[in-house]
Structures are given as C-alpha cells and as structure tokens.
Amino acid sequence: MQIFDELKNRGVEDVFFISMDGVSGLEAGAKSIFPDAVVQRCIVHLIRNSIKYIPSKEYKKYTQSIKRVYGAPSLKAAQSAYDTFVNEWNKYPGAIDVWKRNFIYIEQLFNYGSAVRKIMYTTNAIESVNSSFRKVTKKGTFPNENALFKLLYLRIKELNIKWETGHIANWSMVLNQLMVDDCFKNRINKYIEY
C-alpha cells in the first residue's frame, strides 16, 4: 500500500507493531514494507464489527464477556474464556464469526507480556486524533479552505503539547517485556541511548 511506502520515504526505519482493521490488502502492504512488523487487529474495530449483530440491550454484557478473552492473564485462560464466550453468545452467529475469523490475532497478543498487550489493545492514537479533529471542525462552516487548515494546525499544536508532556503508563515495564525477546531487543537497542 502506498501509505507504507510514504512512511518509509519520510524516514520511518522500523515498525514493531501495527494495529489495523481488516481492510483487504492492508496487512500484505504493511508486511511488504515493514516485514518485521507484527500486525494486530484493532480490538475496538473487532468489537464494533461484531456488536452490530447484538441487540443494544445486551451490549454491555457482550463487551464484558469478550473483554475476558483479550484481557485474560494467559493464552490458556484466553482460550478458555473464548470457549465460554462462544457458548454464551452462539445465538448471534454473525458476532461470533467476527471473532472466529480473527481469533489468531487475539492469540498472538499472548506472545507478549501483559503491559505490552494492554498498550496493543487499548491505545488507538489515530482514532483519538481524528476524534479531536471532528470536535473542532463540527463547529460550522469555514469561509475558505485555508481557515479550516489553520484550525486543524492549531489543534495539532495543542495535541503536540500533550504528547510531549505525556507518557505511556508503565513504559518501563513495556520496554522490559519487549527486551526479553532478542528480536525486539536488537531492534530497540538501535534507538536507545545508554
């Protein structure tokens, strides 16, 4: 895909993880440019894609049930929770099918420590940025395109301040869990100053 070529051309040297929805060809495009990247399905998108098959009065119970799967402490516990989930919700085959097609991505989460997993399934920075843009642009019409660009630029500056002062919770634990894997350790060491 062109987007990954553009990232490479702009200087991105390595990508460890990519969280994406199931758009056809996207995973192959990512892997062709960043072959060492781990491609992960976005849990939020999987929930959204499956919940459309669930009656609204059952949303909360359904999401709590699936959270027991991806939030499990181990792969064995996740597989057990998944079996329970399938048995509990099999009256909605459309919802179950979404998870069956993508369960391999849930399983691969457990190749990493709990701190890494939490970041992989709870962080969706791009959607957060898009949501922020929608908030500032829904205020009305703009006299011209340049006015819109200025507003978006100012919002980006505000977000940048947050990003510069913010931090990823438990980052030292995440880093240590990644450093246990020699493949990640060698890649991380290229970018860390000691």
Residues covered by each model-derived region:
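RNase H-like nuclease fold core
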Residues: M1-S19, S24, A28, S32-D36, ...
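Amphipathic, well-packed alpha-helical segments that form the structural scaffold of globular domains
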Residues: F4-D5, K100, I104, N130, ...
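Conserved, well-structured core segments
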Residues: F17, Y121, K150
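Short, conserved catalytic/metal-binding motifs centered on acidic residues
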Residues: I18-D21, H45, W99, I126-N130, ...
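A glycine-rich phosphate-binding loop feature that marks nucleotide/adenosyl-phosphate handling sites
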Residues: D21, K100-E107, I168-V174
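Extended amphipathic alpha-helical interaction segments
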Residues: K31-A125
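Basic, amphipathic alpha-helical segments enriched in Lys/Arg and hydrophobic/aromatic residues
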Residues: S131-Y194
